[in-house]
């Protein structure tokens, strides 16, 4: 079994959710909503993780959230709570989202640029990376003025650095090497 972000147990739960999801994209959107809630509201995450909080109280909370999400996901979260796995719910859902991306042949990338990318630039990057990886690309654009121009792309463990700052550093290194070699001659 493939081990994703949350470890073996989270992976098992995520694969179970994936296998019972008749409409994966609908469940995916709902899972993204729950992940957002858990990441942005630390109290809810701590509440679900706390072993001193009764299952009944946790179930009541899930029922409140259940008004906004798919019934399959609500039932799944109830099973997670009943099995005392509320402490890894975020990991389970993130692993599920990774499975959906893999199923849809998607890859998330991070693009660091000195300014916000235009729609045209994003499309160009997506097209180029689709050719390279054969997957649909979703971009997260991070702004870092220190790179001066160009961009840095991070895809899993690959880094493509075509920033002006990187280019200038390379020129500095080449200049130093040229000066050293001319002095030694």
Swiss-Prot record:
Protein name: ATP synthase subunit delta
TM spans (from-to): none
SUPFAM superfamilies, alphabetized: N-terminal domain of the delta subunit of the F1F0-ATP synthase
Record's subcellular location: Cell inner membrane
One Pfam family linked to the record: OSCP
Self-association and partners: F-type ATPases have 2 components, F(1) - the catalytic core - and F(0) - the membrane proton channel. F(1) has five subunits: alpha(3), beta(3), gamma(1), delta(1), epsilon(1). F(0) has three main subunits: a(1), b(2) and c(10-14). The alpha and beta chains form an alternating ring which encloses part of the gamma chain. F(1) is attached to F(0) by a central stalk formed by the gamma and epsilon chains, while a peripheral stalk is formed by the delta and b chains.
Keyword Cell membrane in annotation: yes
GO molecular function terms listed in the Swiss-Prot or TrEMBL record: proton-transporting ATP synthase activity, rotational mechanism
Membrane topology: Peripheral membrane protein
Keywords assigned by UniProt, alphabetized: ATP synthesis, Cell inner membrane, Cell membrane, CF(1), Hydrogen ion transport, Ion transport, Membrane, Transport
